[in-house]
Amino acid sequence: MASTVFLTNRSAESVELNDNDVPLINLAEVETDGKSATASVFGLMARKAICNEGLGCTLVNKDYDPNIKIPVPQRVKNDNDLAFPYGDKEPKDTVFPNVDYDQLQKAMDQAFTNNEVQKTRTVLVAHKNHIIGEKYLEGFTKDTPILGWSMTKSVLATLYGILEYEGKIDLNEPVLLEGWEKDDRKKITLNHLLRMQSGLEWEEDYTSISDVTRMLFMDADMTKAQGEKKAIAAPTEVWNYSSGTSNLLSGILRKRFKTHQEYINYPYQALIDKIGMSSMLMETDMKGNFVGSSYAWANTRIGLSLDYCI
């Protein structure tokens, strides 16, 4: 609720209808003052999210100190006169003779049918670097930031790719977290983590209280959850989708910088602002780590632009 209202300027009523109207979540009572939101179910387990300009919103617990100054990313947004996919100016109206625009429109309309279940917000279709189809749910526009969820993992992985390209990192070097040197986890490399082939135990189940839901909704420091798990297979032996791994990588990335300011600047300086994704914002956990598994916001055009770049 807090992020959606604060970052997208949508009403609380719109969020309740289009985002939170699902079993269990729709039981929550939410209070918001524009800079924070508190939610609870039947008056129990109240959780609060606070919002800060430039950082988005963060779940906090009883240890949160509002008097501590939080560093904000120092951004230099590069506005240019380029259209999609190289900038955010309006694309040229280009018609392709081999595209059946009537069928395209029907396909986009279909994406919004039965929308009380599908909950489609936007549809964007591109062909040969041109936007040829675009449709939005009422209340959404081309400028509305949308939560990227696991697309955020691609942003994080790209940052590691940039570091490798610049010769600043060896993806085949062992990670060697504290305690890993004592067992088979000492064999795990950055490459294994990026490919989600580390062999570490992890449960990615959003329908129950699991590793991923505990991490995203309970942990003040989301970078630790995966690193505390035991190995259940040798590296490369199995593939296991893990948001915990992405946040572990976010924590490892943080340790490569001398200051927290350098860390929170890096995604914007190296990638996001550098290629003109000015509407994108990455949120952090309570300890200031980027939630590299899930919490990047951007409008739909920017999201597709990133796909083109990758």
Residue ranges and their predicted role:
Residues 43-115:
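Non-catalytic propeptide/linker segments at domain boundaries
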Residues 38-39, 105-140:
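A short, well-structured edge-of-sheet supersecondary motif
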Residues 129, 146-172, 193, 248-253, ...:
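Active-site SXXK
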Residues 165-201, 228-231, 258-297:
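Active-site helix/loop module of the DD-peptidase/beta-lactamase fold
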